[in-house]
Amino acid sequence: MENFADSTKVAWQTDDGKTTFCVPIASVIHGFIYNTAIFDELKLTPPTTVAEFHAVLDKIKADGKYTALDIGTADQWESATMGFQNIGPTYWQGEDGRKALIAGTAKFTDAPYIDTWKELASWAPYMGDGYQAQKYPDSQNLFTLGKAAIYPAGSWDIPTFEKQADLKFAAFPPPVVKAGDQCYISDQLDHGIGLNPKSPNLDAAKTFLTWVASPSFAAVYANALPGFFPLSNAKIDVKDPVAKQFLSWRQTCKATIRNSYQILNRGTPNLENELWGVSAQVMNGALAPDAAGKQLQADLDKWYHPAK
């Protein structure tokens, strides 16, 4: 376990951090995937600021041939996962903001969260016709067919798109609000493996987990499943070009995990599920950003006392 930084163990630890019960394996990173052929055709460059992002979206929309922003709200979870949790860390400053929510010193009614929903609401004019009925597979198909320019993504989408030989794509990280601002990424702890202490195969399982924790496993895993990134501190040569782009953001951006996962997902109403519905409603124009913050904070206050 010496191959893993403390931050990579959080998803598989007791709250006091004293007991780790899984070997961390991999994370997924959020960002935006774009069709490079469309960008070349329209003479666009990947945006680095929110203003540049909207300028690019305006140009794609004005051209009229492609859906500018390929995301739907029918399934709801995409609105939270590839929307709110993708761009939000830029506004609430990653781990600082996430930990402040847990401590109760920040609320969903604060400006960083309202500003995140305001930005999500501004996406609507760039999304496809009927996006309210568009499901996750619909979004994937639209991008795969070359009919959409920008796809709010998780790195787990890379293998799906790479099955299409004719599709050329790349990625850019969530744009910052102002040029020169610190960039943030959601580098979500995704999976680990634990050992049942009552297993009849303890020795064999320990041998396997020792390998799972090794640099050699990390190297195999990173290239066998592009878009799922090893959590060990081993230096890995990721060969997939788009996965390599996503991974490179760890060097320039500060990483965080989704703010609805650690501790705050334990009560009722469930914060993760509430975020789905609230974010989808904001993107549908059915809920104002201020109202979204009030609703989410009120739901959290029903069971999470530090938030009061």
Regions found by a protein language model. Give the residues of each.
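Hinge/lid segment of periplasmic solute-binding proteins
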Residues: 1-30, 54, 84, 170-172
